């Protein structure tokens, strides 16, 4: 595993010893330390640059580094150990975030009410257009009408008689008296299949369409029907077409053919336009010749539903056979063989966290018959990297910034070209002899081996660094050296690069089949009061979206799956969501965007997230898996993305499983106290529900091949069943919260609920104090959300769900208390709410483990997506429909046949709303 990015000061053993001091001392002595480091480094580098040998330091025993992780004393300031105890009071940010969540919840409810009042958009296409008639000419049809039998056969709905009781509406299809094959407008003859410009509204660019019908309506008016082409700016991408971020640019001559059609009066036609269809996989030279003499070209189709840009199956523009519902399914069920799949694909997990997304994708792909291997992972959080590496030992896990990872990939390609692809033996022939012939100074020694590589983009000397193992010294004396310092060691560099390329420690373009990741966009956070609404990408906190797309552009994987919060579709008119979609389309990827709710795939939490598929034109565009559990989806999306919710149509009545509740998830786990120091323990009981039996399965039964055919460590043990320890004051408070559904701080002595559900002090009850002298009911609880909140010290219940799994476990302003115990939910309980298998072990302080779990993509959602990915990769789906109905056996694959013990967990609480 690669270490974290180096700090601004060059790490040496001298600086490493200083950096092992307390953080306060580091801060006070930082400038002095940098001067010392700079001086010592300069001297040593002069020696190394001339000889490739290292000055001998004063030996010192170093603390052992965590396996696969960076030694803190060498390359960065030591991070203080986080105290795994709940803070005494919520800080200002915590309270503000809570109020922001409450406001968002209220706004979501208002959106739902407004949507209900306005009527459901259903499947209405928002891309409809009506052209404005103009001109003084008299357009006319040419020739005889199409034979009646042929016309009735080709356009049957045009000749259906409408009942007198039904008044025609705007969306109703016009009725025809007869059809024609050609027409004349402004003395120009137009035929069926011609591409034309059509008059648009005022201040709008002319529409572009393909004529599919000429007919005389029952009202004696002359009409034509157009199948519309969309410019990039006419699609959901909209204004993002004009931006230019790191080469992201659309070809103005490129248009997209849609299935959208409208009827317009004949004199709306302006002129012909020459449009050619280009195979997206055509050779660039042939493509350039083909489009040289045309006005426009198209290589993909566009659909408003799921903001889809996809291949066109044939040159005549037919989009293939589509079912009426837009849903495909596999009634054959799943193969449940325990053998490892034969077909393999490689995965790069960016912003991986502890690996929830890639783990789920691999599990789902295995069910489809594809062995998807997480070969590389990148994340800035060292604890998350440690967790991922432990659970996926074959993965090259890099603890570094994504932009430095990209810079390293480009430098790695240069090194591979120099030391692997070219014949460098002649150039290096005398290098080893020269190195051996050099006389060693008494304060120097020889480079034994290079054992790591990274890119430093923040230090004084930017560029590639190698981790050097020095001859005669142990691993605690390894150091990072810039490549310039190793100019006299080309054989060592060649040896490292050739071995690294053989092992593929870093991917080159063409090595990666799938890239997944969720680039953080903290610049759109509600707590960020300085959000840049006009140009979100200029906010440094949103730049990772650009980096993610830059990595995609460089590596050109077959598939891309980006996950993010729904706010990317809401903030600044969906700027970031549109940017991501626009980038993929500009890079000639097929693309599709959908919103999925975790609870719909077998979890007792809501959590709605955005998932963006991308697929090379040579591959099948994956579908979205339809829900398998009966969860009511609430909370809308902006109008531009109103048709992107992955759900069944309102008219459909699918057979879904009953929504899961908290009791289904963790009612089998043993009781633990507020302070639980053991991260490994026994279950002490059997599973009680189907979910619990499944979540306890081992890796092989889950089709998790991270450890090959072998069972992984700790299987069968209960891991990370530890709560964040409440401080003494909060523990006293929690012990007085009643064990009942809906209990919270309002049940404590001295609190009274007044008008409008606002809490107030009970004048008849003297204020109660804790043993520390602090009040039983803290002031912040009384004032939170203007006294209307039910969240402070709120207790969950067995028959409920949670809106989302949080990254912090403090009970001050959220409902997170265990249903029957005086503590918050444990890490394992939260992990189950995210669908992590029980064998998945986490590393780091307790607070860090909560963060890893809360930031992860829900594993069952990723698993369902992985199944659809596998089907597309293997060519077992055609990509023509956006949705896929999972086989009935999908939710029970791999589960044991043991009957569940009866357990009463209540009934579903009904609709759930994301907060």
Swiss-Prot record:
Q: What is its EC number?
A: 2.1.1.37
Mind telling me which PROSITE patterns this protein's record contains?
Answer: BAH, C5_MTASE_1, CHROMO_2, SAM_MT_C5
Q: Where is the composition biased (Polar residues)?
A: 315-328
Indicate the principal place this protein occupies in or around the cell: nucleus
Locate the region Disordered. Answer: 1-107, 152-171, 315-338
Provide the reaction this enzyme catalyses. a 2'-deoxycytidine in DNA + S-adenosyl-L-methionine = a 5-methyl-2'-deoxycytidine in DNA + S-adenosyl-L-homocysteine + H(+)
| This protein's name | DNA (cytosine-5)-methyltransferase 3
What is the organism of origin for this protein? Answer: Zea mays (Maize)
Lineage in the entry? Eukaryota, Viridiplantae, Streptophyta, Embryophyta, Tracheophyta
């Amino acid at each position: 595993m690669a270490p974290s990015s180096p700090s601004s000061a060059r790490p040496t053993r001298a600086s490493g010893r200083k950096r092992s001091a307390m953080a306060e001392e580091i801060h006070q002595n930082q400038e002095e330390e940098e001067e010392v480091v700079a001086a010592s480094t300069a001297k040593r580098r002069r020696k190394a640059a001339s000889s490739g040998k290292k000055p001998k330091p004063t030996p010192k025993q170093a603390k052992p580094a965590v396996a696969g992780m960076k030694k803190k004393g060498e390359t960065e300031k030591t991070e203080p150990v986080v105290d795994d105890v709940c803070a005494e009071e919520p800080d200002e940010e915590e309270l503000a975030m809570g109020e922001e969540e409450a406001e968002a919840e209220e706004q979501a409810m208002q959106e739902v009410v407004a949507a209900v009042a306005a009527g459901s958009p259903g499947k209405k296409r928002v891309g409809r257009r009506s052209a404005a008639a103009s001109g003084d000419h008299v357009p006319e049809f040419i020739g005889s009408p199409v034979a009646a039998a042929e016309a009735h056969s080709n356009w049957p709905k045009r000749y259906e008689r409408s009942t007198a009781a039904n008044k025609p509406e705007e969306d109703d299809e016009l009725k025809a008296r007869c059809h024609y094959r050609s027409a004349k407008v402004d003395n120009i003859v137009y035929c069926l299949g011609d591409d034309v410009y059509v008059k648009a509204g005022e201040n709008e660019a002319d529409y572009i369409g393909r004529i599919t019908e000429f007919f005389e309506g029952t009202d004696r008016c002359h009409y034509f029907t157009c199948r519309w082409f969309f410019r990039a700016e006419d699609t959901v991408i909209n204004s993002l077409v004009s931006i230019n971020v790191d080469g992201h640019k659309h070809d103005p001559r490129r248009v997209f053919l849609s299935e959208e059609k409208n009827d317009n009066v004949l004199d709306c036609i302006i002129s012909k336009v020459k449009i050619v269809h280009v195979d997206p996989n055509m050779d660039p030279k042939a493509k350039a010749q083909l489009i040289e003499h045309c006005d426009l070209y198209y290589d993909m189709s566009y659909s408003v539903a799921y903001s889809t840009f996809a291949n066109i199956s044939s040159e005549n523009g037919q989009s293939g056979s589509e079912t009426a519902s837009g849903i495909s399914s596999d009634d054959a069920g799943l193969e449940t063989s325990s053998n490892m799949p034969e077909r393999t694909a490689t995965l790069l997990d960016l912003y991986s966290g502890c690996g929830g997304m890639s783990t789920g994708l691999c599990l789902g792909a295995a069910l489809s018959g594809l062995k998807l291997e997480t070969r590389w992972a990148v994340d800035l959080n060292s604890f998350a990297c440690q967790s991922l590496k432990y659970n996926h030992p074959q993965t090259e896990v890099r603890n570094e910034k994504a932009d430095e990872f990209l810079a390293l990939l480009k430098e790695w390609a240069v090194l591979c070209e120099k030391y692997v692809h070219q014949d460098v033996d002649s150039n290096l022939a005398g290098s080893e002899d020269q190195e051996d012939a050099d006389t060693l100074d008494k304060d120097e020694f020889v480079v034994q081996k290079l054992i790591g590589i990274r890119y430093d983009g923040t230090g004084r000397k930017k560029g590639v660094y190698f981790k050097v193992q020095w001859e005669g010294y142990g691993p605690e004396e390894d150091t990072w050296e810039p490549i310039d310092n190793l100019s006299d060691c080309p054989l060592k560099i060649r040896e490292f690069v050739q071995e690294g390329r053989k092992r593929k420690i870093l991917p080159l373009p063409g090595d990666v089949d799938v890239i997944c990741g969720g680039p953080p966009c903290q610049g759109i956070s509600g707590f960020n009061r300085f959000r840049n609404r006009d140009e979100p990408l200029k906010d440094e906190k949103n730049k990772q979206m650009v980096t993610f797309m830059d990595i995609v552009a460089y590596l050109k994987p077959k598939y891309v799956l980006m996950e993010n919060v729904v706010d990317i579709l809401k903030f600044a008119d969906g700027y970031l969501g549109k940017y991501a979609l626009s980038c993929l389309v500009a890079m000639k990827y097929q693309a599709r965007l959908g919103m999925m709710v975790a609870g719909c795939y077998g979890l007792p939490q809501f959590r709605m997230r955005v998932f963006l598929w991308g697929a090379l034109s040579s591959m099948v565009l994956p579908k979205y898996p339809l829900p398998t559990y009966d969860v009511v989806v609430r909370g809308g999306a902006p109008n531009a993305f109103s048709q992107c919710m992955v759900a069944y149509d309102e008219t459909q009545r699918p057979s879904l499983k009953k929504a899961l509740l908290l009791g289904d998830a963790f009612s089998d786990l043993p009781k633990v106290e507020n302070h639980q120091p053991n991260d490994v323990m026994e279950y002490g009981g059997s599973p009680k529900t189907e979910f619990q039996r499944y979540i306890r399965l081992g890796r092989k039964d889950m089709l998790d091949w991270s450890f090959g055919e072998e069972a992984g460590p700790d299987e069968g043990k209960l891991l990370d069943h530890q709560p964040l320890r409440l401080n003494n004051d909060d523990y006293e408070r929690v012990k007085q919260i009643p064990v009942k559904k809906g209990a919270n701080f309002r049940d404590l002595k001295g609190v009274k609920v007044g008008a409008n559900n606002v809490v107030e002090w009970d004048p008849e009850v003297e204020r109660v104090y804790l043993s520390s002298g602090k009040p039983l009911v803290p002031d912040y609880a009384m004032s939170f959300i203007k006294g209307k909140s039910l969240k402070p010290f709120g207790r969950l219940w067995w028959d409920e769900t949670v809106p989302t799994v949080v990254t912090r476990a403090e009970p001050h302003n959220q409902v997170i208390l265990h249903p029957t115990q005086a503590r918050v939910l444990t890490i394992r309980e939260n992990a189950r709410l995210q669908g992590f298998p029980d064998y998945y072990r986490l590393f780091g302080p307790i607070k860090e483990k909560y963060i890893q779990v809360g930031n992860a993509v829900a594993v069952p959602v990723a698993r369902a997506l992985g199944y659809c990915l596998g089907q597309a990769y293997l060519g077992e789906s055609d990509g023509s429909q956006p949705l896929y109905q999972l086989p009935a056996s999908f939710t029970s694959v791999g589960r044991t046949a043991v009957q569940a013990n009866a357990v009463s967990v209540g009934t579903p609480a009904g609709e759930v709303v994301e907060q």
